[in-house]
Amino acid sequence: MDKISSIRGMPDVFESDTNYLAELNETLSRIFLSHNLNEVNTPILEQTELFIRSTGVTSDIVNKEIYSFNDRNEQSLSLRPEGTAGVVRSIIQKKLDTAEHKLWYQGPMFRYERPQKGRFRQFNQAGVELLGFEEGSSDLEIISIVCDIFIELELENSVLRINHLGDKDTKEKFLSELLKYLKTYKGELSDNDKEKLNKNPLRLLDSKDGDLKDFLDKGPKIIDFLSSEQLNLLDKIQSVFGKYVEIELDSSLVRGLDYYTGLVFEAVSSNLGAQDSFLGGGRYCLLYTSPSPRDLST
């Protein structure tokens, strides 16, 4: 009989690391409680359709990384790859989506990725969801929480990158110009990038292909299509919080999930090597229209 060992990318965690994780969770929970957030726990298993409809059919999570299987009733279930979709599903299912909610959670997530330094197939993740609040005030509060994390954990050599993806009209105008620009480069795209071009061209903006990246750097920028109100939000974030953490405006930042609209952000550290991102998020109004007909700013 072959020796039984742990699944690749799913490490055992012993005392030194469990103590560190306990301290980290205690610090994060203290920060979240100081912002009057309430803890929520959702199941590790969800219907696969939830993640297809929320993260997007073109997302890497759905196409490459999700752990799915059929149960005895031939229902497709998945280990959660992220926490947001389950929280939103819970709020809608319990008919709580007509009120405002400030929630936080933490727990194990699962993604079928190539294990490497800083990236595992089972990993712990903490998250914050501000549900039902209008754009602007909640965006500033979420950045305030991020800054508190930077300060409390004394994060060094770290930068907070921000961008704004605009609203539906902004995206449509920008995508129209982007597609015109990309026509001259279409023949140079890889098969994978051609698929992104056909299904979700915004995904090309965070391409790691050097030649494509250089080409896109000279093309249209979404920031040029933003309203004065949207630009003012980015300016306010930089002016209010820039004194506490280093903030960069990154027009290529789109994040990896289809449900983001409006503000997006990502924290990176030069201490982490190639996998330098350790925190990220953004506004996701469209996620509420995926599992539910209700429209709720989130």
Question: What is each residue range found by the language model?
Answer:
Residues 1-17:
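Auxiliary tRNA-acceptor-end handling modules of aminoacyl-tRNA synthetases
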Residues 4, 51-55, 260-262:
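Short secondary-structure transition/capping segments
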Residues 17-37, 46-47, 64, 74, ...:
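Positively charged, Gly/Ser-enriched RNA/tRNA-binding surfaces
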Residues 40, 44-77:
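Polyanion/phosphate-binding surface patch
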Residues 54-58, 175-176, 263-266:
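Short low-complexity, flexible loop/linker segments enriched in glycine and/or proline
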Residues 64-71, 177-196:
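Acidic, His- and aromatic-enriched active-site or binding-groove loops in soluble protein domains
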Residues 163-176:
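Short, conserved secondary-structure transition motifs
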Residues 297-298:
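N-terminal low-complexity segments that are often proline-rich with Ser/Thr-Pro
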